[in-house]
Regions:
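Internal, glycine-rich beta/alpha segment that forms the wall or movable "lid"
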Residues: 2, 77-182
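N-terminal beta1-alpha1-beta2 module of alpha/beta enzyme domains
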Residues: 1-61, 164
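Alpha-helix-loop-beta-strand connector modules within alpha/beta enzyme cores
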Residues: 47-69, 125-132
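Hydrophobic faces of well-ordered beta-strands that scaffold small-molecule active sites
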Residues: 4-10, 35-37, 65-69, 96-100, ...
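Acidic (Asp/Glu)-rich catalytic clusters
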Residues: 25-29, 54-63, 85, 89-96, ...
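Active-site nucleophile and cofactor-binding loops and adjacent substrate-binding regions
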Residues: 44, 68-76
Length: 185
């Protein structure tokens, strides 16, 4: 039987008077299992970058898990994300859940000079990212040739101390199939 976790989405707002780290500390005090931070490059108000904010939250808390909700795969190279995840998980004492998604805000792709992704690209990219992450986390060297991403004898060292859970933010039959086959939630 699966465990049921309760979490709180912490706003990544950088507007004056906001304090996402204080919000995360309060969630921990209240007994929440995780805090999540959404991943958008810009919005209607000033915002912190997700990965940096999660690192800050992990350093300021001691028990609560941290989750990018969800890290848009097309914004970052999956092998680099796997290394970032291993590092944050290790430094936080094993509290990372890696949330991944295909990215849906096409205006963010354009605004930041990222190549546009079709729905097929977004689903394929999530699947390839999971295969790459799990490969570099478990193999001494990992080579992968996908439709969108590749690695050549990539190494992530040290290896994760435990299996890092991967959650996907998806919709649509094909993406839900990837969730069922490869993800932990």
């Amino acid at each position: 039987m699966s465990e049921l976790w309760f979490g709180l989405n912490v706003s990544p707002s950088a507007a004056p008077g906001t304090d996402p780290v204080a919000d995360a500390r309060r969630a921990e005090e209240l007994g929440y299992d995780f805090v999540s931070v959404n991943d958008h490059l810009h919005g209607t108000a000033p915002r912190h970058e997700t990965w940096t904010l999660l690192t800050w939250i992990a350093a300021a808390t001691s028990r609560i898990r941290v989750v990018p909700r969800v890290l848009a795969v097309p914004y970052r190279n999956p092998a680099v994300v796997a290394k970032m995840a291993e590092t944050l998980d290790r430094l936080s004492g094993g509290r990372l859940v890696l949330g991944l998604g295909g990215g849906y805000a096409d205006e963010e792709f354009r605004a930041f000079g990222l190549p546009a992704r079709t729905p097929r690209d977004k689903v394929d990219g999530m699947e390839e990212a999971i295969r790459i992450a799990r490969g570099v986390w478990s193999e001494p060297e990992f080579s992968f040739q996908g439709r969108l991403y590749r690695t050549e004898e990539a190494r992530v060292e040290p290896k994760p101390a435990h299996r890092i859970p991967i959650w996907l933010g998806t919709y649509g039959d094909r993406a839900l199939g990837v969730t069922g086959r490869l993800a932990d939630g």
